[in-house]
């Protein structure tokens, strides 16, 4: 409401059931809207944003949707997989594809903060940036990584987790 009152277009993304009036926004992207024909209703919030990014990339680059999905997956499938698992969404249909691809991306991740977090819990004992010593599984994400990521928001600020995923500094990630 604050941004809208100042003339800023707002796009709301969500994945929860819609109850009552939708927010006053330029767009409300939610597969669970009663008027939404999208067939898969069980995307996590991060999955909704992923689909929105794919649509933007298709339009922005003027490329076929499958090419846009490949580009966005290459950059973000790891984070979308973590978010989908952490949100305890059912791992079927689109979520299954996103998580399967994302887990493989995590195994070869160059994200400094994600590598530091995985190293901190002992999944990659040699500390190298080579492929993981063990396969990364949804169980590992759900029971080991996700609680640590969520703890930042409960103990201090969720911004700490965001900073961890965005940093290029191993020293900062290890702190």
Language-model features, listed with the residues they occupy:
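Short alpha-helices
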Residues: 24-65, 73-85
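Short acidic, glycine/serine/threonine-rich loops at helix termini
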Residues: 1-2, 21-26, 40-42, 61, ...
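N-terminal small/polar loop signature for handling phosphorylated ligands or for N-terminal nucleophile
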Residues: 1-24, 28-31
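Glycine-rich loops and low-complexity Gly/Arg-rich segments
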Residues: 9-13, 35-38, 52-55, 169-172
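Alpha-helical scaffold elements adjacent to nucleotide-binding pockets in ATP/GTP-utilizing enzyme cores
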Residues: 2, 48-52, 101
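Hydrophobic helix-and-loop "lid/oligomerization" segment in the mid-to-C-terminal part
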Residues: 58-175
């Amino acid at each position: 409401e604050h941004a809208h009152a100042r003339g800023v277009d707002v796009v709301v993304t969500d994945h929860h059931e819609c109850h009552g009036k939708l927010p006053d926004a330029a767009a409300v992207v939610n597969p669970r809207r009663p008027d939404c024909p999208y067939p898969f209703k069980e995307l996590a919030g991060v999955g909704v944003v992923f689909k929105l990014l794919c649509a933007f990339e298709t339009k922005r680059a003027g490329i076929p949707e499958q090419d846009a999905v490949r580009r966005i997956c290459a950059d973000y499938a790891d984070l979308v997989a973590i978010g989908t698992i952490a949100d305890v969404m059912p791992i079927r249909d689109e979520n299954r594809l996103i998580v399967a691809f994302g887990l493989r991306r995590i195994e070869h991740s160059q994200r400094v903060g994600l590598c530091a977090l995985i190293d901190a819990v002992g999944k990659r004992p040699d500390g190298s940036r080579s492929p993981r010593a063990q396969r990364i599984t949804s169980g590992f994400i759900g029971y080991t990584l996700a609680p640590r990521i969520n703890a930042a928001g409960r103990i201090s600020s969720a911004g700490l987790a965001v900073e961890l995923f965005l940093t290029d500094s191993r020293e900062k990630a290890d702190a």
